[in-house]
């Protein structure tokens, strides 16, 4: 329980800082089996774009949806959808997770395909 609570406290602290920037944020969440990404508006009221390993187009390309390759595909897809809506500059909200492994892979993939953060 302490590990989860610490992550939630880190996430809350990060979101507080990001809200002061008043730009869209890329929120990333991961479970043992899936990776989720959403771009949320600066006033925190609307989801502007989303992608996850639950989508058939992504899950069909990989054998297991909880790995780095799947996170790379989610990063690519979220970047494409953001650029379609003319969103180029965002803040990266890792939801208290370490910038390592799948989270890092998703972020680098989103940067590679055109998002700036």
UniProtKB/Swiss-Prot annotation:
- Alphabetically list the UniProt keywords: Ribonucleoprotein, Ribosomal protein, RNA-binding, rRNA-binding
Looking up SUPFAM superfamilies in the UniProt record yields: Translational machinery components
Keyword RNA-binding attributed: yes
State the InterPro entries in the record: Ribosomal_uL18_bac-type, Ribosomal_uL18_bac/euk
Name the GO terms of the biological process aspect. translation
Q: Name one GO cellular component term.
A: cytosolic large ribosomal subunit
Q: Kindly list the cysteine pairs connected by disulfide bridges.
A: none
Please name the CDD domains in this protein's record: Ribosomal_L18_L5e
Q: Does the keyword Protease apply?
A: no
Q: Name one GO molecular function term.
A: structural constituent of ribosome
Q: How does it assemble?
A: Part of the 50S ribosomal subunit; part of the 5S rRNA/L5/L18/L25 subcomplex. Contacts the 5S and 23S rRNAs.
What does the protein in this record do?
This is one of the proteins that bind and probably mediate the attachment of the 5S RNA into the large ribosomal subunit, where it forms part of the central protuberance.
Q: Which family does it belong to?
A: Belongs to the universal ribosomal protein uL18 family.
Protein name per UniProt = Large ribosomal subunit protein uL18
Say which species the protein is native to.
Wigglesworthia glossinidia brevipalpis
